[in-house]
Amino acid sequence: MNDHKGLGGLDTEATPGSFGAGEPPRALGQAGLAAENELDAPLASKLMTVNLGPSHPAMHGVTRAVVELDGEMIRSMKLDIGFLHRGFEKSCENVTWTQCFPYTDRLNYVSSIMNNVGFALAVEKLCKLDVPERAKYLRVVTSEIHRICDHLTLVGAMAMELGAMTVFLYAIEARDIIYDRLAELCGARLTSNYGRIGGVARDTPDGWIEKTEKTLDRVKGYVDEIDQLVSRNRIFIDRTRGTGVVPRADAIELGFTGPCLRASGEPYDLRKAAPYLVYDRIDFDIPVGTNGDNFDRFQMRMEEMRQSDRIIRQCFAQMEPGEIAVQDFRYVLPPKPLVYGTIEGLMAHFKIIMEGIQVPAGEAYGYTEAANGELGFYVVSDGGGRPYKLGLRAPGWPMLAALPFMSVGSLLSDLIPTFDSINMIGGEVEQ
């Protein structure tokens, strides 16, 4: 017999007939089975619907995203737009051709001159106008200046919403000094109203080119500083690499253009593929990404700002004195001495102001490589002083429509940099 004693001196050896001796364990009761099954069953989760917008600080405009979440994972997304719809196309059909320019300013208001240029190119095709050389160069210069402004806005906002507030301050400071130069040229910092059918509104003030070159030097310093702060920052890279991925084939299928398409590996740029104005005389490179993710889209903007700097400086070197608008007073207001000194000048001025320019009947499509991609204007004229029909191809809409494709299956925290990287501008998308 085992003499071992348990606690309290009790004999720990089981005797025949005692509990647990010589018999199998008894079956678990219903409560025990339920407890055992709960341990084996997966954790239950409940889907949650979250509204982002329409007045959310990260949405960059009044856009609403209805996101269905499984924990932190996005399971589905629906976009709700139209909060900023102003009837752009119909409004333009009720004013003269020249009066359309302020409406185009309010599409992508961060780079408004590009909108002016695209509309002017479409109307000039119908009128068969050949714009003077200096006007072409001024259009390119101002468009590229506004491209830098647009990209600085994206770079600053995207970095800020990932925690890099310093980058935002640098970007806004750089953009602010560029707006100072635009205000000197156009009279306005944001909505420029600089475009005109047949040319541009005004020539450069004395010393403006030299001041702009010095401004570009300062902006280049800011861009280099931003590059050092975030492009090799481990946190920034981890948050942007591999998120919001759009492969090349899908980007083409979804209708991407501009930096978002090039970030996916497709080297398509209208300034090279279908040159307009004087882009065929300018030497510049087209940056192309490889992964099509948020990091590549960020880097596209960084490099494009440097290329825009190259383009502007080459335009300054090539540009010569000359007219800034065609001297056809059916389309351009005559100079004041002619208006006040001749009956022909007075009549031409009166007809343009009261009736608008008379655009030959027909239809045309004008395009530009805007900051976000291909910006297109389809115009139809019945021979009168107002557009019969105007259609807009907004570059931001295909990217916004693809946001569910880019975000479903990823984390909620990745949605914000993905949204930033497409640079959705509400005025352009919702018109």
Swiss-Prot record:
The keyword NAD applies. Keywords: Cell inner membrane, Cell membrane, Membrane, NAD, Quinone, Translocase, Transport, Ubiquinone. GO terms for molecular function: NAD binding; NADH:ubiquinone reductase (non-electrogenic) activity; quinone binding. It is a peripheral membrane protein. It holds the Pfam family Complex1_49kDa. It catalyses: a quinone + NADH + 5 H(+)(in) = a quinol + NAD(+) + 4 H(+)(out). It is an enzyme of class 7 (translocase). One of its GO terms (cellular component) is plasma membrane. Its EC number is 7.1.1.-. It comes from the Bacteria. Residues 1-27 are annotated as: Disordered. NDH-1 shuttles electrons from NADH, via FMN and iron-sulfur (Fe-S) centers, to quinones in the respiratory chain. The immediate electron acceptor for the enzyme in this species is believed to be ubiquinone. Couples the redox reaction to proton translocation (for every two electrons transferred, four hydrogen ions are translocated across the cytoplasmic membrane), and thus conserves the redox energy in a proton gradient. PANTHER family: NADH DEHYDROGENASE [UBIQUINONE] IRON-SULFUR PROTEIN 2, MITOCHONDRIAL, NADH-UBIQUINONE OXIDOREDUCTASE 49 KDA SUBUNIT. Belongs to the complex I 49 kDa subunit family. This is NADH-quinone oxidoreductase subunit D 2. It comes from Anaeromyxobacter sp. (strain Fw109-5). The lineage of its organism: Bacteria, Pseudomonadati, Myxococcota, Myxococcia, Myxococcales. The gene is nuoD2.
